[in-house]
Regions:
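Beta-strand-rich ligand- or partner-binding modules
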Residues: 1-123
């Protein structure tokens, strides 16, 4: 039988954390609404993120033409690392195409990093 030895060298890529940024969900078709709510789950990958300052949620019912900033409320921990925040009854411009946008601020590699792990919309 043959016996061999090999060396595996994984490819490493340096990641850069941007101090600010946004991401937007895809539209969900619903009955016409002018009031929305949401639940998000997130992790403080590094440091402690402040809701409504470092993590900002915006809601839209008109496919993102008009966003309304929501005031997130801390709902405690889902598990030892995952936190939950929510908002209800946010008045938005009426529509049938529900979307969310999350904005990040004050992020710094190794000292403050937010990781959003889930988003649920209510209408």
């Amino acid at each position: 039988t043959a016996v061999g030895c090999g060396i595996f060298t994984p490819y490493l890529e340096n990641l850069t954390v941007n101090p600010s940024g946004t991401f937007e969900g895809t539209a969900i078709t619903a009955s016409s609404t002018d009031s929305m709510g949401a639940v998000i789950s997130y992790k403080n990958n590094a440091g402690t993120n402040v809701l409504n300052t470092d993590i900002v949620l915006q809601l839209s019912a008109d496919n993102g033409s008009n966003y309304t900033t929501a005031t997130l409320v801390d709902n405690g921990n889902l598990d030892s690392q995952t936190k939950v925040a929510s908002v209800s009854d946010v008045t938005v411009t009426a529509g049938t195409q529900l979307k969310y946008k999350i904005e990040f601020a004050n992020q710094a590699s190794g000292s403050k990093e937010a990781r959003i792990t889930g988003v649920a919309l209510q209408y």
